Amino acid sequence: MGYAIAEAALTEGHHVTLISGPAFVQPPRNANLIPVSTSDEMFEAVHRDADKCDICVLCAAVADYKPANVSSTKIKKRGAKFSLELIPTRDILDSLGHKQDRQFVLIGFAAETEHVEENAVKKLRAKHCDIIIANDVSGADSGMESDVNEVTILFRNGEKTKLSRAPKKNIARELVKIFSNFATKMFDKKNVTIN
């Protein structure tokens, strides 16, 4: 969804910074691409650029855990079993949501396999997002590895909007309109203009 949203935003005339891990899809040509390889690089890049944004959309499926120790050499086989210690990665969405001086609209994604809306609302509140996009990724025909999606957009004021199953490019165009309208209303209250 990230690349589709970036493309839709560019089509609408927005300036787009795309912070992306390795992907099989070509990034939009006119986006300012910042390539990253690890969750730590993603965290640092997002924090470096977030305050330059009017709208910050976090839809990358960043791993929740990473190896505690990284080996620069091959780990030799030592027996039948091997345990790998994992530690939590830094939570990018949570850290941005809790910034005291945040001036941008914060939009997160909740890819869920059960209790989709309920879990998304919890994430919206816990991470202090303005909007969260909930999508059910339990089926093979929708979500991350599919060209189609259907989503529920949940707003911090309790409102929600559903976008029915459609190609991701269509969903992305609708999301960009919703994000822009939300930001315009929010910034109008603060007497600020979005670029």
Where are the regions that the model predicts?
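Catalytic-loop motifs flanking and including active-site residues across diverse enzymes
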Residues: M1-G2, P88, I92, I171
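Glycine-rich phosphate/diphosphate-binding loop of Rossmann-like nucleotide-binding domains
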Residues: M1-T38
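Short, well-ordered alpha-helices that flank and scaffold nucleotide-derived cofactor binding pockets
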Residues: E7, T11, H98, K177, ...
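Structural motif
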Residues: H15-T17, N32-L33, D54-C56, F104-G108, ...
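Generic beta-structure capping elements
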Residues: G21, A60-A61, L154-R156
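Short, glycine/serine-rich, charged loops/turns that create anion-binding
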Residues: A23, T113, G158
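Glycine-rich phosphate-binding loop
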Residues: T38-A110, E114-D141
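Glycine-rich phosphate/adenylate-binding loop
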Residues: D101, V116-N195
